Amino acid sequence: VDELIKDLRSHEKLIKISDDTLDDLPVFVKKPNYDRSKLKPGIVHIGLGNFHRAHQAWYLHRLMQRGEALDWAIVGAGIMAFDKEQRQKLLSQDCLTTLVELDPDGQSVEVIGSMIDYVEITDGNSALIERMIQSDIKIISLTVTEGGYFQDPNTGDLDCTHPDIQFDAGNTQSPKTVFGAIVEALRLRRLQRNGPVTLQSCDNLQGNGNILRKTVVSLAKMSDPSLASWIDENCSFPNSMVDCIVPATGRTEIDIVKSLGIKDTAPVTHENFRQWVIEDNFCAGRPAWEKVGVTMSDDVHAFETMKICLLNAGHQILANAGEILELQTIDECMAHNEIFSLFDTVQRDEIAPHVDDVPGMTPEQYLQLISKRFANPKIKDTVRRVAFDGGARHSGFVHPTIRKAIASGSKIEGLALVEALWARMCEGTRENGSVIKPNDPSWASYQEIAKRAKNTPCVWLDETHDYGDIAQNEAFRAIFTEQLDRIWSHGVKSAIVHYCSSDP
């Protein structure tokens, strides 16, 4: 393969991926062996980012390579400005995607073809609604990020006061949000007797199916209580755990694909690990994902807890400290002595004790696995990407463990330090004086509070609206205050060393 790549680099012409050029791709590129013209849609997926294409779309592609699930092809959809550009890119290459697996021992390349169309993005989401009501669609799946569910951070319920939710409740036929579009589509499916569908969240949220159910049913109830009852009683919302590290695509990733002789305007790079655990709860059928490595289970809670509390929380430990010290990527954070010590100590001493075993994996084994994955030098997963939307990520990934630790009287010093590092990062400057660009939907508010917390640390707990009952715990308040004071007085490295060298 290396010799073939060298030969390709000597030629300037790139092969633009399309149905017509699949046979022209280099011999080392794996490609669809099925007739894509015979694929039929079965899934509408909202949120065609990199993760979906490297994960869910890949699993479906693997089934299609076996000659199965040919009537479960994906129709892409979205409602954001990004989605319009993404739609143009993917349609220009027949909805094919080049996946490059980056392993420390080498790389492999695959073009997947499980997606066949991309819904036009229109005002009022009329085209999306129209596609979701068609009887051939059996699953509506989503990757809209952890912060995209309009949750009240303290209660976990739908924030019915949010302006976009208020708008959708009063303008059901021309909604702004994904969830408003789903509610309207379900109303029409019910009216036209096209049957219920499975609504499948693929986001990093514990109980993501339960959260999606609550969001959709609560929004429907605001305008049509009988519809809300029909949705709750007839549609299914399976919980799932998803896992694969997928960096954002930038110039580096596009250049990697070009070096292979391929022109793809929206390629995806990913690590050599995937996991998908799904609650087997589908009201209108599903692909046989278990044939290609997906774990179908009656209970995914233990898998979710292990992944969210160790991997996702671990990402926040690394990224917040790394941003303050101007590190660029997660593998750089893992190679940084103090940051790695913080990551390893907090995980082993304060998070892992609250995580149960899952079949075939203990928390200790899982920590070893994710440490190896995070340290992969080929995956240039940026600190900025991982630290984005800290409000949603700390609330969803770190705070559940803090609550467990408080309730059990366990150690919280490291967890408090992690939260203090987030507050320090949100102040907006690094230790070298450089400015951190806004990186959160609520950045302006967080930054204003973080600046005041420099002198009065508990302001951060009291006014960010992310902590709820945690902010009322006197022990946590005292330790958080101590940790943030130490960060500002002595620096991040000193604060970490002090914590890691303290008696257990």
Label every PLM stretch briefly.
Residues 1-504:
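Substrate/ligand-engaging "lid" and interaction regions
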